[in-house]
Amino acid sequence: MIISFVNNKGGVLKTTMATNVAGSLVKLCPEQRKVILDLDGQGNVSASFGQNPERLNNTLIDILLKVPKFNGANSSIEIDDCLLPVYEGLDILPCNFELNFADIDIARKKYKASDIAEIVKQLTRRYDFVLLDTPPNMATLVSTAMSLSDVIVIPFEPDQYSMLGLMRIVETIDTFKEKNPNLKTILVPTKVNMRTRLHNDVIELVKSKAHKNNVAFSEHFVSLTSKSSAAVGYEKLPISLVSPTSNKKYQTEYLEITKEILNLVNHGHQ
């Protein structure tokens, strides 16, 4: 199963959602293998597990540029050289700042979008769940990820700017459904404070619009909290994988969202 996390707006907890859905899958599907492929040049997936993406020896860009394994080597860096085990049953394939230039590199024919697609396909042969964290735009890496996905998760902050951007993303996704009619989409509110009228109103408005466009809308949301960043900062893990103590409420939110994603794909309720 390929799950992409997409929004062309930054700051909506996209990477946080990707890493915590992965952590929830560890709990829900312990026997199945999961991997997160980081397609965002900020490298925040690595940072979520206590890794500095700029200090890693091998990353996604090395595979794409066919960097030799060592000086004078006839063979280039492969997927196995880049995978990092970060938790039992969960690996990451990291990237770094160089991936920010993907569109320029592709235009200069250093590699092709189909090379990225091939890496994803190779991962699906080895893992039950392949999660794709994408950059905050709608450029080549994002369109490639969406074209390969079984489900696209769109986290969004319920502010006054949400509606227009979200509907444009949904319209873009509709073009991929022509080739992949089974593609599912789900909108998930993040940074939610239900004590504010604005958040309540925007959520209801987006939900209504989503249903009219045959797009799933999560029954659960991610509450506004600083605990997720604290978990990464102190424990070098997403909040879904740290000790429950004071984090149980937020762990439950991600767990329920993950169940909805699985149900959407397995039973087609959209």
UniProtKB/Swiss-Prot annotation:
Superkingdom: Bacteria
InterPro entries attached to this UniProt entry: AAA_dom (IPR025669), DNA_Partitioning_ATPase (IPR050678), P-loop_NTPase (IPR027417)
Family from the record: Belongs to the ParA family.
Protein name (Swiss-Prot/TrEMBL): ParA family protein MPN_688
Organism from which the protein derives: Mycoplasma pneumoniae (strain ATCC 29342 / M129 / Subtype 1) (Mycoplasmoides pneumoniae)
